[in-house]
Amino acid sequence: MSSIIRKVISTSKAPAAIGAYSQAVLVDRTIYVSGQIGMDPSSGQLVPGGVAEEAKQALKNLGEILKAAGCDFTNVVKTTVLLADINDFGTVNEIYKTYFQGNLPARAAYQVAALPKGSRIEIEAIAVQGPFTTAGL
């Protein structure tokens, strides 16, 4: 049996992990990206402006990690969106769909009691290194 590749993915263009975890892990061709909040990687602080600005920054951070793994948003097959207030879903969805277009990933969204650093949003993702072929059912 051949061994499976496992590699930690890291970039200084996204916030460093604030706990005992990696920004992302590549296993074979699948990338598991840890939850990203709206933290500015240079300051280590949440961006000001509320959930909309935090969502943009979280997605920017996600994009930088994907790029470090040789991917982009088109490689994402599943996301999980955690919200401090589910009433922010509409606002977040408008921003989300500017990053994900065409063949959209599967997604789950939940309201949670609290998020790291008082964030209003956290987004995690699973991506697969391409290339892809779109098939009909």
UniProtKB/Swiss-Prot annotation:
InterPro entries cross-referenced by the UniProt entry: RidA, RidA_CS, RutC-like_sf, YjgF/YER057c/UK114
Keywords: Acetylation, Cytoplasm, Hydrolase, Lipid metabolism, Mitochondrion, Nucleus, Peroxisome, Phosphoprotein, RNA-binding
Reactions catalysed according to its record: 2-iminobutanoate + H2O = 2-oxobutanoate + NH4(+); 2-iminopropanoate + H2O = pyruvate + NH4(+)
Compartments reported by the entry: Cytoplasm; Nucleus; Peroxisome; Mitochondrion
Any one GO molecular function term: RNA endonuclease activity, producing 3'-phosphomonoesters
A Pfam family that the UniProt record links to this protein: Ribonuc_L-PSP
Residue numbers of N6-succinyllysine PTMs: K13, K60, K67
DNA-binding found in the keyword field: no
Location of Phosphothreonine modifications: T74
Gene Ontology biological-process entries: G1 to G0 transition; kidney development; lipid metabolic process; lung development; mRNA catabolic process; mRNA destabilization; negative regulation of epithelial cell proliferation; negative regulation of translation
A Gene Ontology term for the protein's cellular component: cytoplasm
Main location: cytoplasm
Tissue distribution of the protein: Liver and kidney.
Superkingdom field: Eukaryota
Signal sequence bounds: none
EC number: 3.5.99.10
PTM sites of type N-acetylserine: S2
SUPFAM superfamilies assigned to the protein according to its UniProt record, in alphabetical order: YjgF-like (SSF55298)
Function: Catalyzes the hydrolytic deamination of enamine/imine intermediates that form during the course of normal metabolism. May facilitate the release of ammonia from these potentially toxic reactive metabolites, reducing their impact on cellular components. It may act on enamine/imine intermediates formed by several types of pyridoxal-5'-phosphate-dependent dehydratases including L-threonine dehydratase.
Family, per entry: Belongs to the RutC family.
NCBIfam families per the UniProt record, alphabetical: Rid family detoxifying hydrolase (TIGR00004)
Subunit composition and interactions: Homotrimer. Interacts with YTHDF2.
PANTHER family: 2-IMINOBUTANOATE/2-IMINOPROPANOATE DEAMINASE RIDA, 2-IMINOBUTANOATE_2-IMINOPROPANOATE DEAMINASE
Name under which the protein is recorded: 2-iminobutanoate/2-iminopropanoate deaminase
Species of origin: Rattus norvegicus (Rat)
